[in-house]
């Protein structure tokens, strides 16, 4: 039975917050302030809070009181959901009061709140295409990212004309908490940050709005300072996995080409997800002089990964620091490895920390951001022949075996499927050579098989992407070159 939309939304706000029935008129007027009184008589069959919020926005657009751009609607939507979101002081007090007796419950409650108030965009994330496919490195995870709405040309034009602002300085800054938002900066009225201390400095813990995996979290420094991989990084990551049970924590590299999309603000990512790289075995055990108590090995992975395990955090930090310092100064001309050129450093590490079976674990992924005439985008970056699938930087998440592919692939891969079935002659020019190869390999392909064939090929290409990004190749020569670096570490003071 249809009910009044505003009244139903207010009822849900009262049920999901500290507001009481006596606050109904006040809340109703808050809603009218945001979406206009023209929605007063709209009815609904829904009782889900986020659905009701979306219907209020649609009704406001229809009534002319809410703008048509996604960005304008997001600003108002976040304010509507802020009505059920406790103040930052309350969020933090609740988190740490619960944490004292049950850290897992504190984390679960904060995650539930972040979904309930639509900060984590559960409905949007559900639109992503996601699957696993076997490769010689184990199952890789493939996602086509459809959760973030593509920019409307009107929004792009509006952003160009918007008044310039450097507040907040970036999308990770603490000042985003409760920020209204604007055309060129996301709405954050319903955003909350849990504060915690590392090294006697304030850090923030939040969830990612457009999560790429379960409980995708961000841990960021309270001040706007650039990313930097250092001995402190290893200690912080291990502190995080100790403080947040069941979570991994990792950092993007701190150099262009091999780094993430945000290098201007020190931050790490984490969450409750087992990535393909984590379950990859050890290809060859190695040892480091003076660290017989630390298990070490080269991981069976397309990128160049050293895995260290120990019960002692400080021993892991010390060895990881030695490896980082050695890698930053290491060159091997035959292997195509160069520490620096013209004063520009090329070497860094993508580190990932876990706590498993009573031990701390660090994966150190060796990175090199050289370019050349043949590979202007990066020698250890997806090469031209695979850029039709992935041309962006290979950051932390991809390093671990989860491909984040662009929205364009949804329609482009469907066109490739139709082409293989003889139902269409058009594929995007960047896919033509690949589509012809698939057609030659599968001349009698059926409609029942075609999606799986294309998806498997995408996974195989992603494995090649990771091989391109690997400094040492996965053949015997590459293994010998990798072990030569281990020997170099052992010779260092």
Curated annotation (Swiss-Prot):
This is Galactose-1-phosphate uridylyltransferase. GO terms for molecular function: UDP-glucose:hexose-1-phosphate uridylyltransferase activity. Keywords: Carbohydrate metabolism, Cytoplasm, Galactose metabolism, Nucleotidyltransferase, Transferase. The gene is galT. Its main location: cytoplasm. Belongs to the galactose-1-phosphate uridylyltransferase type 2 family. PANTHER family: DUF4922 DOMAIN-CONTAINING PROTEIN, GALACTOSE-1-PHOSPHATE URIDYLYLTRANSFERASE. Its EC number is 2.7.7.12. It holds the Pfam family GalP_UDP_tr_C. It catalyses: alpha-D-galactose 1-phosphate + UDP-alpha-D-glucose = alpha-D-glucose 1-phosphate + UDP-alpha-D-galactose. It is found in: Cytoplasm. The keyword Cytoplasm applies.
């Amino acid at each position: 039975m249809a009910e009044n939309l505003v009244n139903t939304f207010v009822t849900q706000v009262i049920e999901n917050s500290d507001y009481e029935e006596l606050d109904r008129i006040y809340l109703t007027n808050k809603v009218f302030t945001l979406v206009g009184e023209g929605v007063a008589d709209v009815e609904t069959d829904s009782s889900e809070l986020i659905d009701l919020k979306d219907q209020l926005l649609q009704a406001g657009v229809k009534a002319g009181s809410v703008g048509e751009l996604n960005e304008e609607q997001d600003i108002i939507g976040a304010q509507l959901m802020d009505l059920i979101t406790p103040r930052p002081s309350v969020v933090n007090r609740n988190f740490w009061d619960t944490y004292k007796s049950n850290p897992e419950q504190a984390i679960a409650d904060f995650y539930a709140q972040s979904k309930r108030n639509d900060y984590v965009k559960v409905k949007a994330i559900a639109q992503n295409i996601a699957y696993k496919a076997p490769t010689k490195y184990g199952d890789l995870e493939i996602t086509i990212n459809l959760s973030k709405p593509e920019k409307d040309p009107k929004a792009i034009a509006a952003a160009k004309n918007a008044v310039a602002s450097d507040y907040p300085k970036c999308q990770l800054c603490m000042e985003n908490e409760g920020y209204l938002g604007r055309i060129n900066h996301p709405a954050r009225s319903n955003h909350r940050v849990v504060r915690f201390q590392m090294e006697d400095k304030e850090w923030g813990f939040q969830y990612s709005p457009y999560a790429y995996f379960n409980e995708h979290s961000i841990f960021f420094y309270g001040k706007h300072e650039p990313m930097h991989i250092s001995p402190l990084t290893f200690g912080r990551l291990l502190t995080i996995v100790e403080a947040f049970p069941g979570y991994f924590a990792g950092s993007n590299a701190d150099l262009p080409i091999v780094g993430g999309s945000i290098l201007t603000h020190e931050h790490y990512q984490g969450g409750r997800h087992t990535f393909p790289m984590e379950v990859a075995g050890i290809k060859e055990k190695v040892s480091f002089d003076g660290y017989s108590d630390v298990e070490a090995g080269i991981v069976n992975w397309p990128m160049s990964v050293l895995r260290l395990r120990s019960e002692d955090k400080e021993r892991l930090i010390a060895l990881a620091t030695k490896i980082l310092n050695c890698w930053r100064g290491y060159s091997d001309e035959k292997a195509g490895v160069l520490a620096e050129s013209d004063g520009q450093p090329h070497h860094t590490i993508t580190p990932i920390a876990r706590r498993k079976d009573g031990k701390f674990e660090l994966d150190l992924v060796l990175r090199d951001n050289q370019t050349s005439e043949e590979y202007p985008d990066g020698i250890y970056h997806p090469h031209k022949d695979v850029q039709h699938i992935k041309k962006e930087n290979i950051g932390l998440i991809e390093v671990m075996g989860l491909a984040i592919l662009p929205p364009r692939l949804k329609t482009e891969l469907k066109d490739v499927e139709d082409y293989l079935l003889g139902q269409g002659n058009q594929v995007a020019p960047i896919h033509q050579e690949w589509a012809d190869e698939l057609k030659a390999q599968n001349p009698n392909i059926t409609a029942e098989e075609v999606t799986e064939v294309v998806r498997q090929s995408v996974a195989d290409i992603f494995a090649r992407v990771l091989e391109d990004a690997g400094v040492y190749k996965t053949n015997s020569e590459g293994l010998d070159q990798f072990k030569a670096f281990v020997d170099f570490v052992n010779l260092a003071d």
